[in-house]
Amino acid sequence: MADFRPVEATKARILSIHPAPSGTTIEGANAEWIEVLVQLDSDLANWRLQHLRALWREEVAKPVEWEWVYTWGSPSFVRSGEVYRVHSGSRMRAASHALPDDLAPGRKHVYVAGPVAAAKLMWVRGDYARLVDAFGTVIDEIVVWPEEEKPKPQETPARR
Protein backbone atom coordinates (compact mmCIF):
# COMPACT_ATOMS: atom_id res chain seq x y z
CA MET A 1 0.00 0.00 0.00
CA ALA A 2 1.35 3.41 -0.96
CA ASP A 3 2.06 6.00 1.69
CA PHE A 4 -0.63 8.70 1.34
CA ARG A 5 0.43 12.21 2.29
CA PRO A 6 -2.06 15.01 1.69
CA VAL A 7 -0.83 18.27 0.19
CA GLU A 8 -1.75 20.16 3.38
CA ALA A 9 1.02 18.34 5.21
CA THR A 10 3.70 19.59 2.82
CA LYS A 11 2.83 23.30 2.72
CA ALA A 12 5.08 24.39 5.60
CA ARG A 13 7.13 23.09 8.50
CA ILE A 14 8.86 24.40 11.60
CA LEU A 15 12.44 25.23 10.70
CA SER A 16 13.92 26.18 14.08
CA ILE A 17 13.22 27.68 17.47
CA HIS A 18 15.36 30.12 19.41
CA PRO A 19 14.41 30.59 23.06
CA ALA A 20 15.67 33.71 24.81
CA PRO A 21 18.92 33.32 26.75
CA SER A 22 18.51 33.13 30.52
CA GLY A 23 18.30 36.53 32.13
CA THR A 24 16.49 38.11 29.17
CA THR A 25 13.92 40.72 30.20
CA ILE A 26 10.54 41.39 28.60
CA GLU A 27 12.10 44.29 26.69
CA GLY A 28 14.31 41.72 24.95
CA ALA A 29 11.48 39.33 24.04
CA ASN A 30 12.08 39.90 20.32
CA ALA A 31 15.31 37.91 20.68
CA GLU A 32 13.10 34.84 21.15
CA TRP A 33 11.52 33.38 18.01
CA ILE A 34 10.37 30.38 16.03
CA GLU A 35 10.83 30.05 12.27
CA VAL A 36 8.42 28.44 9.82
CA LEU A 37 9.58 27.50 6.32
CA VAL A 38 7.03 27.56 3.50
CA GLN A 39 7.55 24.60 1.16
CA LEU A 40 4.76 25.14 -1.40
CA ASP A 41 3.19 28.20 -3.00
CA SER A 42 -0.13 28.06 -1.19
CA ASP A 43 -2.55 29.66 1.25
CA LEU A 44 -1.82 29.27 4.97
CA ALA A 45 -5.15 30.84 5.95
CA ASN A 46 -5.93 30.15 9.61
CA TRP A 47 -2.82 28.05 10.20
CA ARG A 48 -1.55 28.52 13.75
CA LEU A 49 1.47 28.07 15.95
CA GLN A 50 0.69 26.45 19.28
CA HIS A 51 2.77 26.55 22.47
CA LEU A 52 2.47 23.54 24.81
CA ARG A 53 4.00 23.07 28.24
CA ALA A 54 3.91 19.76 30.04
CA LEU A 55 3.03 20.32 33.68
CA TRP A 56 3.92 16.82 34.90
CA ARG A 57 1.24 16.51 37.57
CA GLU A 58 0.06 13.02 38.48
CA GLU A 59 -3.38 14.19 39.61
CA VAL A 60 -4.21 15.61 36.18
CA ALA A 61 -5.19 13.18 33.41
CA LYS A 62 -3.69 15.31 30.64
CA PRO A 63 -1.20 17.60 32.35
CA VAL A 64 -0.65 20.01 29.49
CA GLU A 65 -1.03 23.77 29.33
CA TRP A 66 -1.33 25.31 25.85
CA GLU A 67 -2.02 28.54 24.00
CA TRP A 68 -2.17 29.78 20.43
CA VAL A 69 0.89 31.88 19.68
CA TYR A 70 0.28 33.15 16.15
CA THR A 71 -2.42 32.76 13.48
CA TRP A 72 -1.92 33.43 9.78
CA GLY A 73 -4.71 35.63 8.44
CA SER A 74 -7.25 34.73 5.80
CA PRO A 75 -6.26 34.74 3.01
CA SER A 76 -2.54 34.30 3.59
CA PHE A 77 -0.89 33.58 0.27
CA VAL A 78 2.71 32.47 0.70
CA ARG A 79 5.56 31.55 -1.65
CA SER A 80 7.79 28.51 -1.52
CA GLY A 81 11.05 29.29 0.27
CA GLU A 82 9.69 32.10 2.46
CA VAL A 83 10.71 31.93 6.10
CA TYR A 84 8.44 33.46 8.71
CA ARG A 85 10.18 34.39 11.95
CA VAL A 86 7.54 34.68 14.67
CA HIS A 87 8.96 36.75 17.55
CA SER A 88 7.62 36.49 21.11
CA GLY A 89 7.94 40.23 21.51
CA SER A 90 6.30 43.38 20.26
CA ARG A 91 6.02 44.92 16.81
CA MET A 92 6.26 48.36 18.44
CA ARG A 93 9.49 47.43 20.21
CA ALA A 94 10.94 46.13 16.94
CA ALA A 95 10.12 49.40 15.18
CA SER A 96 11.89 51.49 17.81
CA HIS A 97 14.72 49.10 18.80
CA ALA A 98 15.39 46.78 15.87
CA LEU A 99 17.76 43.88 16.42
CA PRO A 100 20.54 43.59 13.80
CA ASP A 101 19.08 40.28 12.61
CA ASP A 102 15.67 41.92 12.05
CA LEU A 103 17.16 44.04 9.29
CA ALA A 104 18.66 41.08 7.40
CA PRO A 105 16.82 40.21 4.17
CA GLY A 106 15.23 36.84 3.51
CA ARG A 107 12.85 36.54 6.44
CA LYS A 108 9.39 37.88 7.12
CA HIS A 109 9.27 39.08 10.71
CA VAL A 110 5.96 38.85 12.54
CA TYR A 111 5.28 39.50 16.21
CA VAL A 112 3.07 37.83 18.79
CA ALA A 113 2.43 41.09 20.65
CA GLY A 114 1.31 44.46 19.28
CA PRO A 115 1.91 46.79 22.23
CA VAL A 116 5.16 46.51 24.18
CA ALA A 117 3.27 45.61 27.38
CA ALA A 118 1.77 42.50 25.70
CA ALA A 119 5.18 40.94 25.00
CA LYS A 120 6.20 37.88 26.99
CA LEU A 121 8.93 35.28 27.11
CA MET A 122 7.37 31.89 26.49
CA TRP A 123 9.81 29.20 25.37
CA VAL A 124 11.60 27.15 28.03
CA ARG A 125 13.39 23.81 27.90
CA GLY A 126 10.91 20.94 27.46
CA ASP A 127 8.14 23.00 25.83
CA TYR A 128 6.65 21.99 22.48
CA ALA A 129 5.81 24.14 19.48
CA ARG A 130 3.26 22.86 16.99
CA LEU A 131 2.30 24.01 13.53
CA VAL A 132 -1.42 23.32 13.11
CA ASP A 133 -3.42 23.66 9.88
CA ALA A 134 -6.85 25.31 9.58
CA PHE A 135 -8.59 22.00 10.35
CA GLY A 136 -6.66 21.37 13.58
CA THR A 137 -4.29 18.77 12.16
CA VAL A 138 -0.79 18.88 13.64
CA ILE A 139 1.52 19.37 10.67
CA ASP A 140 4.82 19.67 12.51
CA GLU A 141 6.09 19.67 16.08
CA ILE A 142 9.38 20.59 17.70
CA VAL A 143 10.70 20.32 21.26
CA VAL A 144 12.43 23.31 22.79
CA TRP A 145 15.82 22.05 23.87
CA PRO A 146 18.42 24.83 23.81
CA GLU A 147 22.07 24.13 24.33
CA GLU A 148 23.06 24.41 27.96
CA GLU A 149 25.08 27.47 28.80
CA LYS A 150 28.66 26.50 29.43
CA PRO A 151 30.09 27.74 32.72
CA LYS A 152 32.85 30.27 32.31
CA PRO A 153 36.24 28.99 33.41
CA GLN A 154 37.39 30.55 36.65
CA GLU A 155 40.66 32.37 36.57
CA THR A 156 43.17 31.15 39.09
CA PRO A 157 45.35 33.79 40.70
CA ALA A 158 48.98 33.63 39.69
CA ARG A 159 51.32 32.43 42.42
CA ARG A 160 54.67 34.02 43.10
Where do the model's predicted regions map?
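Short aromatic-acidic-glycine turn motif
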Residues: 53-66
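Eukaryotic short linear interaction motifs
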Residues: 43-44, 56-58, 93-94, 138-139
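A short linear-motif detector with a strong N-terminal bias
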Residues: 12-15, 27-30, 62-65, 106-110
